[in-house]
Amino acid sequence: MASRQAPLCGLAPCCLWLLGVVLLMNASARPANHSSARERAGNREENEILPPDHLNGVKLEMDGHLNKDFHQEVFLGKDMDDFEEDAEPRKSRRKLMVIFSKVDLNTDRRISAKEMQKWIMQKTAEHFQEAVAESRAHFRAVDPDGDGHVSWDEYKVKFLATKGHNEREVAEKIKNKWDLNIDEETQEVLENLKDRWYQADNPPPDLLLTESEFLSFLHPEHSRGMLQFMVKEIIRDLDQDGDKKLSLSEFISLPVGTVENQQGQDVDDSWVRDRKREFEELIDANHDGIVTMAELEDYMDPMNEFSALNEAKQMIAIADENQNHYLEPEEVLKYSEFFTGSKLVDYARSVHEEF
């Protein structure tokens, strides 16, 4: 698989090769994902070497759920942490209006779809740069001899060490091809990781990853081949009839069983509504009711300019109360929760304060 040196031209999410993720019940049972990216965390050692289950600026999570934070990630970029729920409202409103001014390239006090598209691409590029920097640091953690290559055995030793195994003992067992005595769940995760390792290994395969290949291993959105592999895994997980395509009913499948209370019913209703809108408005490009691998790949490619434009139009439509196809300061402030994750009160009055 060739590593992508330049951003893909063809967006922005997947699969069961994730670390630590339990297999889903079956393709028709997809529970809603209630946690946001801000709430996800693992132990530090695992975070240094394991592929993340959340990719900033990618529409789908690695388990096939919609990325709940996507709009904030591509609108706020590195400023996302500044808009926490307990932030001082006036300060947050001012920051939001500063961002508005940056997106508004022609300074006409309204944001067009083209302006939003350019902003989305800029913020996505920032996430790409962050991923490269993080991957470089993590590569050093798994390349103990500093030879610029990481073997599968070297990685396996580090991985098992994060699971509580003695690093020296594991290395000795692997060297002598002795039984590692690991539990079934850990073995399954290792097999999934090895499959992913093979996919990131540029031909001719040697099970040695360079720094750029290791980036593709951790962040499949940086590699065309890994992105395609990711798409195949998603379709495999969701495809119920085996046609290697996704129908609307397959994409919005709910967990098996009856909800126990109204809150659970509301969650299910929200799951169906959000995924139906995403399927019909953004993923199914030719609107034939079927999503192909090519359509899902375009949707998941973070640097696909056409998908970024569609996303920009959808983001504007959500807050465009006067339906003029532009975003105005009042609308951005009123729908601040959508753009920032925080609800900022007194939005109308603050427009005059901040401008």
Curated annotation (Swiss-Prot):
Q: Which residues make up the binding site for Ca(2+) 1?
A: D104, N106, D108, R110, E115
Major subcellular site? Golgi
Coiled-coil boundaries: none
- Position of the signal peptide: 1-29
UniProt modified residues of type Phosphothreonine = T186, T210, T258, T292
Q: Which GO terms describe its molecular function?
A: calcium ion binding
One Pfam family assigned to this protein is EF-hand_7
GO terms, biological process: calcium-ion regulated exocytosis
- Which positions are annotated as binding Ca(2+) 5? D320, N322, N324, Y326, E331
Q: Which residues bind Ca(2+) 2?
A: D143, D145, D147, H149, E154
Subcellular location field: Golgi apparatus lumen
Annotated binding of Ca(2+) 4, by residue:
D284, N286, D288, E295
Q: Report domain EF-hand positions.
A: 91-126, 130-165, 226-261, 271-306, 307-342
Q: Which SMART domains match?
A: EFh
Keywords, sorted A to Z = Calcium, Glycoprotein, Golgi apparatus, Metal-binding, Phosphoprotein, Repeat, Signal
Family designation: Belongs to the CREC family.
Function recorded in the entry: May regulate calcium-dependent activities in the endoplasmic reticulum lumen or post-ER compartment.
Q: What is this protein called?
A: 45 kDa calcium-binding protein
- The organism's lineage? Eukaryota, Metazoa, Chordata, Craniata, Vertebrata
